[in-house]
Amino acid sequence: MTKSELVELIASKQTQLSVKDVELAVKSIIEHMSQSLADGQRIEIRGFGSFSLHHRAARTGRNPKTGDAVQLPAKFVPHFKPGKELREQVNDSMKKGF
């Protein structure tokens, strides 16, 4: 699902809100979450999951075109850990689908 599909879905279910209002809300939530992660904060949404930063150590990689070794620097990457309710909901719906 893309951001625009999410906006359309929410707007269709919340008829009192315009598409523009929903779009602004979704955009604002994403911006605030991104900024919180950039500031090194952990985000926890109970029943959904948590977002945190994980450290990736420097390593030697390979250029896929040339095969040459390339040094990749250490970095922090966003990590999502689904909450128990989300895991159970996804697992239950996948069991029904198979």
UniProtKB/Swiss-Prot annotation:
Keywords: DNA recombination, DNA-binding, Transcription, Transcription regulation, Translation regulation. Signal peptide: none annotated. The keyword DNA-binding applies. GO terms for molecular function: DNA binding; structural constituent of chromatin. InterPro entries: Hist_DNA-bd, Histone-like_DNA-bd_CS, IHF-like_DNA-bd_dom_sf, IHF_beta. GO terms for cellular component: chromosome; cytosol. PROSITE patterns: HISTONE_LIKE. It comes from the Bacteria. Pfam families: Bac_DNA_binding (PF00216). GO terms for biological process: DNA recombination; regulation of DNA-templated transcription; regulation of translation. PANTHER family: DNA-BINDING PROTEIN HU (PTHR33175), INTEGRATION HOST FACTOR SUBUNIT BETA (PTHR33175:SF5). Belongs to the bacterial histone-like protein family. Heterodimer of an alpha and a beta chain. This protein is one of the two subunits of integration host factor, a specific DNA-binding protein that functions in genetic recombination as well as in transcriptional and translational control. This is Integration host factor subunit beta. It comes from Marinobacter nauticus (strain ATCC 700491 / DSM 11845 / VT8). The gene is ihfB.
